Amino acid sequence: MSDHHPTGPSAPGTDALSQLGRATTTPQSPEEAVLERVPSPHQGRQYVVRFTAPEFTSLCPVTGQPDFAHIVIDYIPGEWIVESKSLKLFLTSFRNHGAFHEDCSIAIAERLVALLDPQWLRIGAYWYPRGGIPIDVFWQTGEPPKGVWIPAQDVPGYRGRG
């Protein structure tokens, strides 16, 4: 009998993961959400990792009405990369969380920076209009390293029906 793992051998540094490959439930809040990291498979190289969440949702802290955003997160890893299922669950945990657009956007970026200590990270949060005004929030940790190809986020501005 072989030691065949149905999904392949474990990648280095993944033994401590608590969510990947397991049944999970949506965390009730961003504070309850567990973000996990794994060792970067290409330490010493500069490359960009992009996550796009085109259907991000949260709640207005005053009215309780839903807010929607297209979020793009770009980062250049240091020693760590974020485990994507934990990121998905973290982002989904905002679904019932009341906070202003700016707060949600910056909280996401700061939580990732605290977890990963990346060489560089930026977030573009393109919020759909509320009261007729779209709010876009942009933040980054500083200047990106030279010589790294960082594609434009290319999220078109809100055009309504036009």
Curated annotation (Swiss-Prot):
Gene Ontology molecular-function annotations: preQ1 synthase activity
Residues binding substrate: 82-84, 101-102
List of catalytic residues: 60, 67
GO-annotated biological processes: queuosine biosynthetic process; tRNA modification
Keywords: Cytoplasm, NADP, Oxidoreductase, Queuosine biosynthesis
Catalyzed reactions per annotation: 7-aminomethyl-7-carbaguanine + 2 NADP(+) = 7-cyano-7-deazaguanine + 2 NADPH + 3 H(+)
Compartments in which it is found: Cytoplasm
One GO location term (cellular component): cytoplasm
Record InterPro entries: GTP-CH-I_C/QueF, NADPH_dep_7-cyano-7-deazaG_red, QueF, QueF_type1
Main location: cytoplasm
Top-rank taxon, per record: Bacteria
Listed pathway(s): tRNA modification; tRNA-queuosine biosynthesis
Catalytic activity, EC: 1.7.1.13
Region (Disordered): 1-39
Pfam families for this protein: QueF
NCBIfam families, sorted: QueF-II
PANTHER family in the record: NADPH-DEPENDENT 7-CYANO-7-DEAZAGUANINE REDUCTASE
Purpose: Catalyzes the NADPH-dependent reduction of 7-cyano-7-deazaguanine (preQ0) to 7-aminomethyl-7-deazaguanine (preQ1).
Family membership noted in the UniProt record: Belongs to the GTP cyclohydrolase I family. QueF type 1 subfamily.
Record's protein name: NADPH-dependent 7-cyano-7-deazaguanine reductase
Organism of origin: Gluconobacter oxydans (strain 621H)
